[in-house]
Amino acid sequence: MATKTYYFYVLLCADGSFYGGFTDDVKARVATHNAGKGAKYTAQRLPVRLLYHQAFADKHDALSAEWHFKHQTRHRKEVFLEDHQVEWR
């Protein structure tokens, strides 16, 4: 039986804000966000662009990564992205 992979991802919204999320299909989830059918937050800040994603074998670990990102200050989110060599500016 194949194991399922879960992802934590970070989007850059049109207003320059970051959005952290969780999914089992990054490509489909980003398309859903850009169709305005994702989170209310991103629907009001279209379009969004995928900046980063990280795979996890365990759902809890992916959800934990999302929770920790969402509870950081803007500065700490920027540091996280820079530490992962993500160009977003």
Swiss-Prot record:
Pfam annotation, one family: GIY-YIG
Q: Where is the GIY-YIG domain?
A: 4-79
List, alphabetically, the CDD domains matched.
GIY-YIG_UPF0213
The record's similarity note reads: Belongs to the UPF0213 family.
Q: Which PANTHER family match?
A: UPF0213 PROTEIN YHBQ (PTHR34477:SF1)
Q: What is this protein called?
A: UPF0213 protein LSEI_1587
Species for this entry: Lacticaseibacillus paracasei (strain ATCC 334 / BCRC 17002 / CCUG 31169 / CIP 107868 / KCTC 3260 / NRRL B-441)
